[in-house]
Amino acid sequence: IKKLLTFLFEHKRKEDQVVVQMDTSATKEVWSACESFEGKPFDEYKLIECALNKNFAQYKNNLNKNCDGDWIFQIDADELPNEYLLEALPFILEANAETEAYWVPRVNTVAGITENHIAKWGWRVSDEGWINFPDWQMRIYRNDENIYWIKPVHEQLRGYTKFANLPADESYCLYHPKNIGRQETQNAFYDTI
């Protein structure tokens, strides 16, 4: 999370607010990393707490309620946006005023993955090692009470009428790197929801 927050504060506009929502079970190290940014003005940084309770939609809806801007770019703690995406996003939103939500391409990489893992999960892996690219994620949407998340896992956004896909180009991507141990742990957790 510290890497993401450092990156966002280096590349965001002053008028953009970063809202971090922490699960009540977050480790002391994660809390410490997030609290280290609390010297930022309130209109630029907000740290909140919410129990996940195995319900990602409810968790994301709580985050939405705590965002003050016109738009929400929901980024997971283990993701990082391409720098160009952050630079271009205000212009994309302004040029497409009727669009309410955007699908963002995501580059997934898993260190330590084997052919057995790929076959087991039915993944497609590119020559670059990108898994299931473009792995579209609905992550940019208007901050509107009528736009909300459903489903506890593999959540889906509802309430918007007009959407668009960003180009399936690395410049517009979220990066989602992990190792095989973390991937297996996440898959096991999702199976309990």
For each predicted feature, which ranges?
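Catalytic-site signature of metal-activated, phosphate-bearing donor transferases
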Residues: F56-N64, L80-I193
